[in-house]
From Swiss-Prot:
The lineage of its organism: Bacteria, Pseudomonadati, Thermodesulfobacteriota, Desulfovibrionia, Desulfovibrionales. This is one of the proteins that binds to the 5S RNA in the ribosome where it forms part of the central protuberance. This is Large ribosomal subunit protein bL25. The keyword Mitochondrion does not apply. The gene is rplY. It comes from Desulfovibrio desulfuricans (strain ATCC 27774 / DSM 6949 / MB). Pfam families: Ribosomal_L25p (PF01386), Ribosomal_TL5_C (PF14693).
Length: 199
């Protein structure tokens, strides 16, 4: 698997609310690139390309961070580590990039997507999810963007645990194999009576 996407950024000068606010007014988002060697490089990223790559890559998919300095461009494989948003606008205020070594494993929280309508729900049960993320470890380019769990065959009192996941090759879960992700429970008598009263 190859790295398919690149985000071009520039090194930035100035720290604190004043300089960061001026950057955001220019639709540039302040951020920090944490290199695999433990160095911190302050960068500024254009808002629209950043938003697009975040929507495509999330926190799980590696892309190249191309840093421009003094007319020279250098690309580093990274994951998006942490993102800060405006309190009421859907706009970035700060972003952290985590540099990875493609030959070394990383551990990432990967979204779990539940699909289908279970047999148990059709019989009156309730689908109860316990986790929306699962912690996985693999080399960066092997990390899945999400894990899809089909609940169609789940009957009442059935549970899908971490050990039931069909993970890609060379990817392992960091949770206990018996850790429950989703179950179908029967409605309690009180719930059934409440629904009957509403009818």
């Amino acid at each position: 698997m190859n790295i398919e996407k690149t985000l071009s950024v520039q090194k930035r000068e100035g720290y604190g609310k004043g300089p960061s606010g001026r950057l955001r007014a220019q639709k540039l988002i302040p951020g920090v690139f944490y290199t695999p060697k433990g160095e911190n490089i302050s960068v500024q990223a254009p808002a629209l390309p950043l938003q697009k790559i975040y929507e495509e890559m999330g926190h799980t998919t590696v892309f190249n961070l191309e840093i421009e300095e003094n007319g020279q461009k250098t690309a580093y494989p990274v994951l998006i580590w942490q993102v800060q948003f405006h309190p009421y606008k859907r706009a970035f205020t700060h972003i952290d990039f985590y540099g990875v070594d493609l030959d070394k494993e990383v551990t990432v929280d990967v979204p779990v997507e539940f699909v289908g309508t279970s047999r148990g729900v059709k019989l009156g049960g309730v689908l109860e999810t316990y986790r929306e993320m699962v912690r996985l470890t693999s080399k960066p380019l092997n990390m899945p963007q999400k894990i899809t769990v089909d609940v169609t065959d789940m009957g009442i009192n059935d549970t899908i645990s971490v050990g039931d996941l069909k993970l890609p090759e060379n990817v392992r879960a960091e949770f206990d194999q018996n850790y429950a992700l989703v179950t179908v429970i029967s409605k309690s008598k009180d719930d059934a009576e409440e629904e009957g009263d509403e009818d």
